[in-house]
């Protein structure tokens, strides 16, 4: 079941837990996966889930429509994406982990899904804030192994140079050449 935003939803930063939460009702809260070090604001606040938030929520849900996620997984990724767009501070690209595929002509679109390739694996990301040279992304794969010791889990937020983004439709052909 897909959750539908309503006027009671509120973003809350819990100083004690150092966590951003989405208060969905009196007895249900969603803990956002964005780590405190990536948040722009780290003091207590409460803010309504806005119309812009709802618009992003439904746009991202639509963009993930063709992917084989369960409804809870889809909602989790999308809520984390909306929170990241709204509350993350500017991130530095860590593109050195990813192979340069240089297959993108132009700027990626909001919600567009791309594959990325590292020395260890490949995975999929969704654009949550497009840029002309680099874009803010959310990991939609279960995980992306960056090196022997570091990986990004699903719903992790990262900034990538656009030259690292492999159009999703071209990924199968590109990856078969690597094998």
UniProtKB/Swiss-Prot annotation:
Major location (coarse): cytoplasm
GO cellular component, one term: cytoplasm
Keywords: Cell cycle, Cell division, Cytoplasm, Septation
A Pfam entry, by short name: ZapC_C
Compartments where located: Cytoplasm
GO terms of biological process kind: division septum assembly; FtsZ-dependent cytokinesis
Free-text function comment from the UniProt entry: Contributes to the efficiency of the cell division process by stabilizing the polymeric form of the cell division protein FtsZ. Acts by promoting interactions between FtsZ protofilaments and suppressing the GTPase activity of FtsZ.
Family classification: Belongs to the ZapC family.
Oligomer status and interactors: Interacts directly with FtsZ.
Name recorded for this polypeptide: Cell division protein ZapC
Organism: Tolumonas auensis (strain DSM 9187 / NBRC 110442 / TA 4)
């Amino acid at each position: 079941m897909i959750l539908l935003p309503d006027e009671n939803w509120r973003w809350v930063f819990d100083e004690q837990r150092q966590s951003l939460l989405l208060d969905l009702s009196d007895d249900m809260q969603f803990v956002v996966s964005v780590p405190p070090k990536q948040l722009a604001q780290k003091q207590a606040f409460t803010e309504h889930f806005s119309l812009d938030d709802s618009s992003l929520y439904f746009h991202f849900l639509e963009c993930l429509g063709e992917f084989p996620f369960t409804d809870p997984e889809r909602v989790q990724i999308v809520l984390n994406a909306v929170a990241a767009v709204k509350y993350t501070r500017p991130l530095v690209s860590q593109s050195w982990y990813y192979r340069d595929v240089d297959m993108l002509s132009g700027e990626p679109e909001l919600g567009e899904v791309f594959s990325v390739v590292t020395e260890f694996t490949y995975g999929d990301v969704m654009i949550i804030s497009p840029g002309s040279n680099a874009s803010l992304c959310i990991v939609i794969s279960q995980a992306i192994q960056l090196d022997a010791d570091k990986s990004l889990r699903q719903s992790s937020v990262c900034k990538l140079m656009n030259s690292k983004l492999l159009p999703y439709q071209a990924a199968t052909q590109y990856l078969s050449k690597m094998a």
